[in-house]
Amino acid sequence: MSYQPNKVLEVFDNPKIERDFIIQINMPEFTCLCPKTGQPDFATLHFAYIADKACIELKSLKMYIWLYRNEGAFHEAVTNQILDDLVQVSNPRFIRLKAIFNIRGGVYTTIITEHKQKNWTPKAKVDL
């Protein structure tokens, strides 16, 4: 079965909508192209989110991320675009995306961006 890059992000119903639980997703093989040189840029993407009504379907996320392999994008722009697209399709209570780009020209770049619903307040954290 062949899969193709796809801009369509899919969601499914949150199975425990009454509970704030954290979903973490790590994608170590993100690739895009430097818009200045055309050279590939590699990053590890770390997602952490608290779903509201919908959870992000992982296969569609993989195919969506794969779409960037042949697109030129600045690190800051692509990280924020991914977050915006995830917010648009799933409207999570909270989401954070941390993109850790591999070294390029002696420079490491890490972009962290997040979104929180206006009226959502996190529950008190319990450390055990």
UniProtKB/Swiss-Prot annotation:
Pathway: tRNA modification; tRNA-queuosine biosynthesis. One of its GO terms (biological process) is tRNA modification. Keywords: Cytoplasm, NADP, Oxidoreductase, Queuosine biosynthesis. One of its GO terms (cellular component) is cytoplasm. GO terms for molecular function: preQ1 synthase activity. InterPro entries: GTP-CH-I_C/QueF (IPR043133), NADPH_dep_7-cyano-7-deazaG_red (IPR050084), QueF (IPR029500), QueF_type1 (IPR016856). The active site is at C34 (thioimide intermediate), D41 (proton donor). Disulfide bonds: none annotated. SUPFAM superfamilies: Tetrahydrobiopterin biosynthesis enzymes-like. It is found in: Cytoplasm. Its EC number is 1.7.1.13. Its main location: cytoplasm. It comes from the Bacteria. It catalyses: 7-aminomethyl-7-carbaguanine + 2 NADP(+) = 7-cyano-7-deazaguanine + 2 NADPH + 3 H(+). Gene3D superfamilies: 3.30.1130.10. Substrate binds at I56, E57, L58, H75, E76. NCBIfam families: QueF-II. Catalyzes the NADPH-dependent reduction of 7-cyano-7-deazaguanine (preQ0) to 7-aminomethyl-7-deazaguanine (preQ1). HAMAP family: QueF_type1 (MF_00818). PANTHER family: NADPH-DEPENDENT 7-CYANO-7-DEAZAGUANINE REDUCTASE. Belongs to the GTP cyclohydrolase I family. QueF type 1 subfamily. This is NADPH-dependent 7-cyano-7-deazaguanine reductase. It comes from Ruthia magnifica subsp. Calyptogena magnifica. The gene is queF.
